[in-house]
Amino acid sequence: MKAKNISYLIACMLMFCSLNTQAQNVFPYPALPDTLRSVEQRATYLSEHYWDNYQFADTTQLKNEEITEQGFVNFIDILARFNDEIAQKGISAFTAKAYAQKPAKEKFESLIEHYFDDPQSPMRNDRVYSFFLAEMKKSPYFDEAEKERIDFKWKAARKNLPGTMATNLSFKLEDGKMHQLSDYQNEKVILYFYDPECENCHKVTAWLKKQTIPAEYRMLRIIADDQISATYSIKAMPTIYLLDKGNIVVLKDCTPELLISVINNN
């Protein structure tokens, strides 16, 4: 299930979600108080109160994809547009309610894994995913074995997030020579991790060759061996990163379409 067409302007999204619809097959969005004037105030309120009208104990509602899954998809879609503080507040409020009953816990664990951990998901976002995992680690509704598994995923999700310096690594390019990522700190870099035998890699490579990539960007095509895959938590091939000068991560594990959009609109 994909996110519905929600405006990229946060203000418009807030107006949409503030409609307190009474339709039976629509997620019960909260009504935003008229006293909240600034976009930040409205975003914070929406984030914290998004699930106020949702009945986590109602198993019939829980099984309704148009309500539960679509509501969750829209939730994580807007969280990705909020800053860390606002997103974390929303996830904390969600966590306090979502896992108290076993059916809801199982349902939302499944949705979180599907939309954030599946390499084919178009909504992957390790920044937001790490916030969910951090709250799950603190929740009393997960046992120690579950928390150990969650902690492993949290550590992987926190690696090389946008805004941080990419982990240095040694790699061999097509010239047969060994290189260090740190050798390219003065350049804008596209890291293209691939497997020579990966059919999807061939398709993406062919597509990228048809695109316009500005001369200021250097593409490093790196065969992802086991060590590199572990260092960068690579889940599928190809995996693409965009780095600014200083090896600062701009995009982590992005789609080729997003890569081209960003580098041609900067």
Q: Language-model features: where?
A:
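Non-catalytic, surface beta->alpha helical segment in thiol-disulfide oxidoreductase systems
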Residues: 245-266
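Short, acidic, Ser/Thr-enriched surface-loop or helix-capping motifs
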Residues: 173, 243-244
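Thiol-based oxidoreductase modules, predominantly thioredoxin-like and allied folds used
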Residues: 215-227
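Oxidative protein folding and maturation machinery
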Residues: 23-168, 173
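Structural micro-motif
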Residues: 232-241
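Bacterial Sec-dependent N-terminal signal peptides
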Residues: 1-26
